[in-house]
Amino acid sequence: MLQHEVIMVASECRGLAKVGGLGDVVWDLGQQLARDGVNVAIILPRYGIIEAQDEAAATFNVPFAGRKFSTTLTHVDVHNGPSLYFIKQKLFFEGEDSTVYVNSATRGRGPFEDDARRFAFFS
């Protein structure tokens, strides 16, 4: 029988980085699919706020906005659940951008300007 595989790419996931209902849906759906025998992987940005023992799986350059950004794919072992992967890039997801969503207005920029840049890179 064919093994189904699902990759879920999201900005939030309960237990790691959650602000609203999206984080609940991503985790609960991933857990249920895994229980149903589906091979599930969840991919998130590696925000600085995430406390996980992840290991580097690959490093590569991502072309974005006319530049190349060194980026690392990391992995966390989860027993009996979805595989967890993170896209780690310091400029977009660490330091002052280490939370899920950023209030750009406090930086004198337009609403959601920083999030638009961060998630365009992530996509």
What are these regions (language model features)?
Residues 46-123:
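A conserved catalytic-core segment of Leloir-type glycosyltransferases
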